[in-house]
Amino acid sequence: MITIETVLTILKNNANFREIIDGKHYQYKYSNPEVAFHHISYDSRDIKASTLFFVKGATFKKEFLEKAIESGLTFYVAEKDYQVGIPLILVNNIKNAMCLIAKEFYDNPQDKLKTLAFTGTKGKTTAAYFAYHILKQGYRPAMISTMNTTLDGKTFFKSKLTTPESLDLFKMMAQAVANGMTHLIMEVSSQAYLVGRVYGLTFDVGVFLNISPDHIGPIEHPTFEDYFYHKRLLLKHSRYVIVNSQMNHFALIKEQVADQPHDFYGKYSDNQIINSKAFSFDLTGKLAGHYDIQLTGSFNQENAVAAALACLQLGASQTDIQKGIVQTTVPGRMEVLIQKNGAKVFVDYAHNGDSLEKLLSVVEEHQKGTLILILGAPGNKGESRRADFGYVINAHPELQVILTADDPNNEDPQLISQEIAHHIKRPVNIIVDRKQAIQKAMSLTQSENDAVIIAGKGADAFQIIKGKRTAYAGDIEVARKYL
């Protein structure tokens, strides 16, 4: 519950209050300070008694508000007056207002949890899983992740966004507190800062894994600089930071965090991976010692080290860290099936040029025969990935390629595939139906030296088509049918 008086105080203290508009009357203080709200929402279909409703988004329509009023809405917050006959709290920035009011409404749950946030172009989910398995050795961590979210350590569900909307985020935090959880691990996207989902939130530990061009397009970031800047905001809003010293533009980040408590990891730091093998590595520095690991690839070892250093700051012992790392597996990350002829099928979430390059390098290290890649690109987002995929594929000339659908949304998957193919300097196959593409690729293998690489969707059991999630069995399940 939150009173209107408290709402107004929060907004005024944040210089985010213009006035209340009630009909033709403008008010600085509301005439009835006893008004209270028992529910907050930004979804016009989610209206209960005493709801404070937030109008957000460029596509919001007046009729949504009118429907909410039919359901009993009596008050709303917005950046403009929709003139719908109920009182309005007019603000300058709706997203900032949502964050600050949600924090108070849910009794500041972030102060009752130790918070750990990961950002980076790739590896956020894997690093979050490492942290989850490390912290659960001695604590009760909750996790909000692209792949899975758990608020009680028992039940898991799929997240719609990498970083939830602020009203959902603070509600989740409050549920975690109510469930007796001690820590919260989450992924923070550049979009979360761009659109203000985590405004006013300071994390106990923030980790910056890496940076490469991604999420650049008309509805995301206009330039790489803008993308990089919004990624770096996590460092500004974290009490302790962990940074990969091998990442691009590290010199700038090193200067930025010089006056903050921090750790660096990687070749150019005290915390270096040595004696790296397929399923183990040694570490120098604060956590010097031997570590076994199930997830193959140097990038997974780097993610493990990042999570280890972060969890050390949050109370984990080195023994907890060693146990947690070896226990970690991630759905849709380097999952492997074996065909009857011995060929391997790799299913991985690699969905940009950088992660695809690392995936191909790991597979090529172990499989020396025919390699067939199945790949697509999402519609209406990250258009720059399409050219990036072409550049990566050109660097692997022996690779056979089948282009297919991967969340085409409102675009034609055939045209998306043709755009990717335009950047590839050799003939490729296009099979838009993803199931048929997987079946075809698996029919081309002959021996244990061969491999099929299914990239992009990981464990996602859906296809996004025309703005909606459409049922799809998932790459692993489809591949199992053709073993």
UniProtKB/Swiss-Prot annotation:
Its main location: cytoplasm. One of its GO terms (molecular function) is magnesium ion binding. The modification N6-carboxylysine is found at residue 231. UDP-N-acetyl-alpha-D-muramoyl-L-alanyl-D-glutamate binds at residues 44, 162-163, 189, 197. ATP binds at residues 120-126. One of its GO terms (cellular component) is cytoplasm. A motif (L-lysine recognition motif) lies at residues 406-409. It catalyses: UDP-N-acetyl-alpha-D-muramoyl-L-alanyl-D-glutamate + L-lysine + ATP = UDP-N-acetyl-alpha-D-muramoyl-L-alanyl-gamma-D-glutamyl-L-lysine + ADP + phosphate + H(+). Carboxylation is probably crucial for Mg(2+) binding and, consequently, for the gamma-phosphate positioning of ATP. It is an enzyme of class 6 (ligase). Pathway: Cell wall biogenesis; peptidoglycan biosynthesis. GO terms for biological process: cell division; cell wall organization; peptidoglycan biosynthetic process; regulation of cell shape. The keyword Signal does not apply. Keywords: ATP-binding, Cell cycle, Cell division, Cell shape, Cell wall biogenesis/degradation, Cytoplasm, Ligase, Nucleotide-binding, Peptidoglycan synthesis. Its EC number is 6.3.2.7. It is found in: Cytoplasm. Catalyzes the addition of L-lysine to the nucleotide precursor UDP-N-acetylmuramoyl-L-alanyl-D-glutamate (UMAG) in the biosynthesis of bacterial cell-wall peptidoglycan. NCBIfam families: murE, PRK14022.1. This is UDP-N-acetylmuramoyl-L-alanyl-D-glutamate--L-lysine ligase.
